[in-house]
Swiss-Prot record:
It comes from Burkholderia multivorans (strain ATCC 17616 / 249). One of its GO terms (cellular component) is cytosol. InterPro entries: Trm112-like. It holds the Pfam family Trm112p. Belongs to the UPF0434 family. PANTHER family: PROTEIN PREY, MITOCHONDRIAL, ZGC:162634. This is UPF0434 protein Bmul_0750/BMULJ_02510. SUPFAM superfamilies: Trm112p-like.
Length: 64
């Protein structure tokens, strides 16, 4: 994921920051507990495509 792109992308719901999970190929919004898929290097920022992250499991913001 291009670092410059990640700097400008925000959660479409809360407009908060996203964290890239390289292993899962997802952009994570910790505030809304949603994960947006990254397909073929392209972030899919549609709410209907997002999945709920596991409640109580913090996502590592470093993407590790």
């Amino acid at each position: 994921m291009d670092a410059r792109l990640l700097e400008i992308l925000v959660c479409p719901i809360c407009k908060g920051p996203l964290h890239y999970d390289r292993a899962a190929q997802e952009l994570i919004c910790n505030a809304d507990k949603l994960a947006y898929p990254v397909r073929d290097g392209i972030p899919v920022m549609l709410v209907d495509e997002a999945r709920q992250t596991v409640e109580g499991t913090p996502v590592d913001p470093s993407g590790r």
